[in-house]
């Protein structure tokens, strides 16, 4: 498997340290089989992925956005999904949350849409609480 990456601030050295090859934004969209988005929402990232980027993707490619909805232009994504220009999308972030009942993402057969709470589980919260208590004890022991 080849891991490619792009970021406005990434250096070739940082990509290599992460086990990836730095490519241009255009190359990322043209080459990726599975494209995952891991960015914070800011004025620089809002609308970063629009129709031009999505239309560069392979028809067999899949997009995963678990960052923030407005990073991907929602109407452009709906368009490429409806037209089967990409194989599918997995998303748990949307322009409007909760996702309205009539939203197209709910009916497209090439969309996996979930709430942005996929990490929530009993085991995870147990770990959070145990780690918190452990950290407090360690701090108290040294002060």
Summary of predicted features, one role per range:
Residues 95-143:
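C-terminal helix-to-coil terminal segments
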Residues 9-104:
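Rossmann-like adenosine-cofactor binding region
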Residues 1-2:
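Residues at the starts of beta-strands that form the adenosine-phosphate
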Residues 6:
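The conserved SAM/SAH-binding core of class I Rossmann-like methyltransferase domains
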